[in-house]
């Protein structure tokens, strides 16, 4: 007998029978005891420690910034692989999302991670953050200009009019 059925069924032996099926005469003593499941105010014993895993309902998406002209908004293209309904081959599917960029730190071509947040506007429900593994253009170090002597061959601009005709 399930718990929901026992709650919906009227008690068999009642001193005050009620003609209604779902009357208000249900006594707390007739309900099953949940003392084993309820949380008590006393701390649990040291032998039993309860750790609940953090449940993240939606995995965060990663994509590439394709437009950053709007203020505090970036347009991100997310590419995912999904099976084709008929041919069962994995096909790339692209979708564009508007994401909130409060500091205008992302430029076109940067990889960002989209985290779900409260709706900021009609189309913006994601927050753009820098992923841990990748570097954005703001945090990427500038490449060092290579010296022209690296090849060992002087450039034409470095040769001083040493031309023979």
From Swiss-Prot:
PROSITE patterns: RIBOSOMAL_S17. Gene3D superfamilies: Nucleic acid-binding proteins. Residues 1-57 form a transit peptide. GO terms for molecular function: rRNA binding; structural constituent of ribosome. Keywords: Chloroplast, Plastid, Ribonucleoprotein, Ribosomal protein, RNA-binding, rRNA-binding, Transit peptide. GO terms for biological process: translation. Its main location: plastid. GO terms for cellular component: chloroplast; ribonucleoprotein complex; ribosome. InterPro entries: NA-bd_OB-fold (IPR012340), Ribosomal_uS17 (IPR000266), Ribosomal_uS17_bact/chlr (IPR019984), Ribosomal_uS17_CS (IPR019979). The keyword RNA-binding applies. Residues 128-165 are annotated as: Disordered. Pfam families: Ribosomal_S17 (PF00366). NCBIfam families: PRK05610.1. Component of the chloroplast ribosome (chloro-ribosome), a dedicated translation machinery responsible for the synthesis of chloroplast genome-encoded proteins, including proteins of the transcription and translation machinery and components of the photosynthetic apparatus. PANTHER family: 40S RIBOSOMAL PROTEIN S11 FAMILY MEMBER, SMALL RIBOSOMAL SUBUNIT PROTEIN US17C. Belongs to the universal ribosomal protein uS17 family. Component of the chloroplast small ribosomal subunit (SSU). Mature 70S chloroplast ribosomes of higher plants consist of a small (30S) and a large (50S) subunit. The 30S small subunit contains 1 molecule of ribosomal RNA (16S rRNA) and 24 different proteins. The 50S large subunit contains 3 rRNA molecules (23S, 5S and 4.5S rRNA) and 33 different proteins. This is Small ribosomal subunit protein uS17c. It comes from Spinacia oleracea.
């Amino acid at each position: 007998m399930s718990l929901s059925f026992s709650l919906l069924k009227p008690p068999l032996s009642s001193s005050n029978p009620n003609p209604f099926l779902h009357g208000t005469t249900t006594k707390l003593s007739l309900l099953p005891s949940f003392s084993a499941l309820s949380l008590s105010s006393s701390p649990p014993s040291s032998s039993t420690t309860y750790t609940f895993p953090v449940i993240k309902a939606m995995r965060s998406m990663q994509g590439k910034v394709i437009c950053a002209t709007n203020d505090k908004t970036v347009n991100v293209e997310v590419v995912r692989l999904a099976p084709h309904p008929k041919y069962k081959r994995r096909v790339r599917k692209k979708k564009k999302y508007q994401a909130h960029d409060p500091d205008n730190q992302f430029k076109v071509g940067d990889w960002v991670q989209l985290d779900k947040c409260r709706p900021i506007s009609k189309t913006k429900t994601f927050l753009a953050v820098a992923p841990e593994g990748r570097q954005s253009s703001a945090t990427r170090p500038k490449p060092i200009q290579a010296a022209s002597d690296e090849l060992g061959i002087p450039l034409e601009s470095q040769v001083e009019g040493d031309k023979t005709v």
